[in-house]
UniProtKB/Swiss-Prot annotation:
Belongs to the glycosyltransferase 2 family. This is Undecaprenyl-phosphate mannosyltransferase. One of its GO terms (molecular function) is dolichyl-phosphate beta-D-mannosyltransferase activity. Catalyzes the transfer of mannose from GDP-mannose to D-mannosyl-1-phosphoundecaprenol. The keyword Glycosyltransferase applies. The keyword Zinc does not apply. It catalyses: di-trans,octa-cis-undecaprenyl phosphate + GDP-alpha-D-mannose = D-mannosyl di-trans,octa-cis-undecaprenyl phosphate + GDP.
Amino acid sequence: MRVLTIIPTYNEIESLPLTLGRLRDAVPESDVLVVDDASPDGTGDWADTRAAEDPSVHVLHRTTKDGLGGAYIAGFRWGLERGYDVLVEMDADGSHQPEQLPRLLEAVRTADLVIGSRRVPGGKMVNWPTSRKMISWAGSLYPRIMLGLNLTDITAGYRAYRADTLRAIDLDAIESKGYGFQVDMTFRTARLGKRIVEVPITFVERELGESKMSGGIVGEAVVNVTRWGLAARWEGLRARLGL
């Protein structure tokens, strides 16, 4: 099973060396693709140097910063073109524990999409205040209700996709740039009838660098989820009425 772990970066020079080192130690059989959006802090240059030393590390440079979704889609296309069997999403900031990747890879042997969940039994969040946990919970509950998805952590970004799952999705139709991208991909996977499994992970708040979350990203996600949910309900109503 050929595995590619995709790590999007923008100004992650403090975090990426630690995360990449841990990943190579924990799962040496996984190749790594760093997708850098022209980081002005030298992240891309550092990644190039590491790739020159390690043939399992690759770098994809993009000229503009156009969001998490665009970076992952570029990474998916790169990996699919090169015949990888499983494509993993992982944050550069250390929030996703590389040492827990084996449990995602084991689960994806019998699933189409595996989500590392903070909310299933055994999952947890570290260094998050209660207020942040409540906001995150609400952010996951809303799409769960609107889209009818029986999952605990729809917005989670630690994931493993089978290549066939990604090939079945029209990646050109993905609209979300920010964290709504995770909801978009989950919804499309579910509508294809694919098997989605959640496994527990420990999510640790970043200690280095700056978060990329913003009000605009949250707003985009809310608007899109509402639109998708209403459209799905309308489709269901038309089908029942024979329209």
